[in-house]
Amino acid sequence: VLSYAFLGGKCRYCKTKISPRYEIIEVLCGLAFVILAAGIGINIQNVYTWKGIEYALGVLYIVFVFLIAGIDKEHREIHKGVLIYGIAISALEFIYQYNFYENFNINRIIIYLIVTAILTVASTYKIKKTTKDDYNISLVIFCLIINFFTFEIGTILTIILTLLIISIKSLINKIINKGKKYNKKPPVAFYLAVSNAIVWIMIFLSQIGV
């Protein structure tokens, strides 16, 4: 943040103007990391225990969500590499839950992993056949990864909030572009990511009594 301010919002080397959006994303990421630490109750005494592992996985998930949001907002695309990263951290979360969750339901997790794997293979096959990614399949995979980290209630709230945001945005666009055709497709993954971040923050704030 300070470097952005001191350099006048320009790259240190090429002097190209840097969009304030990236600085906002960095600030929001930092806030999310702090809220995560407070929600988990991590401190210097327990950072090397299972809480440290939980925090590390949470950080990796936050980065994943922000990557999805940033790319989809710019290009309306869910990058396959980012999805694979999300699946990888889901596998790590699976190992963590298996070892540390008392009410761990292995059947539920296995079903989600199998469905995610099938959808990933289907999406990869379509890319090879048409050279185009399937946005809808990628959205479903994204939702499954969300469910892996925020469970069913968090996923349901995320989807409801996403639909609400898209509806409000569409209504505003219709009012602004009254009498004109507006066919631009919304970046659904971006809104899912934003909604999930809001739901996720609310869950952790409730845990620390805010």
Segments (PLM) and residue ranges:
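A membrane-topology feature that recognizes alpha-helical transmembrane segments
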Residues: 1-210
